[in-house]
C-alpha cells in the first residue's frame, strides 16, 4: 500500500476517523510528502464509554485519540459543537468548521410521488404528520418523542408519527410504543435507502422531530429542510446550529413536556409549520456539491501552507505510537491489578463470612 501511494504521487491525505484510519494515515505520511487533514465527526468519548467500561482504559483511549488529532496538519469539525466536544477531550489546537452537505436536491417531490411512497399507511388528510429518520437508538432522544406523543394523545390531539430507520434499540422502541398505546398512530417503515422515497416522506411530513444532543451535525435536519419540512430540535444542540426558533426551525428544552407544548401549539397553527419549512429550505439547505467545493478551496489553502512550511513538524509516528501503546498497556495492567485486588478482597470477605457462620453454628450447637 505504501509503495502504491508513493507511485500515485499523493498530494494530500484526509482521514475521517481519529483512531484506526488516522493511524494508517499517519504511517503513510512517513512515506509520502503530503499534509494530513482530519475531519472530526462524532462524540467519540460517548462511543468509547459504551465500548470500554474501565475508566482508566477510557482515559487512555481518549489520550491516544487526541494524540492522533494533534498529529494532523489541519483539523476540520462538522459543527461548532463538534469542535467544543473535541476541546473537552483535551485537544488545544486550531480547527476549521466545515459543514456537511446533503445529496438531495432542494424542493418537494410531486404529490404523485408522495402518494406512491406513503401508500399503505393510515395518514388522514388534515392530521399532522411527524417524522423521525435515523438510527433507532434511545440516545437519539426517542424517549422524549414517545413521552411527548403519549401526552399529546391524552390531550385528544390527532396526529401520526412515522419512524424511518433501524437500530439496536428498535425492539425496545416498538415495545414502548405498544406500552404507551400509540401503535394506532405510530408506524415503523424500517430503513429506506432510496433517496427519492425519503424525499417523499420529508415532503409529506409537517414536522421533523430530532431531539438529539448526541449528533454533531444532524444531516437529516438539512435533508428535511431540502423538502421544506421544519425540524424540532433541542436548543443549544449541535443539530440546532444555525436554527432560529420560529424562523427556520423550532427549539425546545430537552424534555417531553417542552416537546409536547411545542407540538400542541404547532398543531393549532399549520400555517406556521409551512412558513418555517419554507424558510428552512432557503436558509438551512446546503448541497453536497457546495460542501465539496468549499472543501476543495480549503485543500488549496492546506497545500499552500504545507509547502510554505507553516505547519509544525510532528513526532515520527512510530515513536509516538509505541509511547502511546506503552501508556495503554500500563493502564491495562493497572486495571488488571485493581481487578485482582478487588477479587482478593472479595475472597477474604467470603472466607471471613464462612468462618463467622461456622463459629455461630458451633456456638448454637453447644447452647442447644
Task: Describe each region flagged by the PLM.
Residues 213:
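Aromatic "clamp/platform" in nucleotide-sugar-dependent glycosyltransferases that forms part
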Residues 69, 191, 199-205:
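Short alpha-helical donor nucleotide-sugar binding micro-motif in glycosyltransferases
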Residues 230-234:
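Short hydrophobic beta-strand element within catalytic cores of glycosyltransferases
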Residues 128-151, 157, 161, 168-174:
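A conserved mid-protein helix/loop that constitutes part of the nucleotide-sugar donor-binding site
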Residues 245-246, 250-256, 265-270:
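Conserved acidic donor-binding segment of nucleotide-sugar-dependent glycosyltransferases
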Residues 81, 101:
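Carbohydrate-associated surface elements
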Residues 174-192:
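Nucleotide-activated donor-binding/catalytic signature segment of Leloir-type glycosyltransferases, i.e.
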Residues 272-286, 290, 297:
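A short, well-ordered alpha-helix in the C-terminal region of glycosyltransferases
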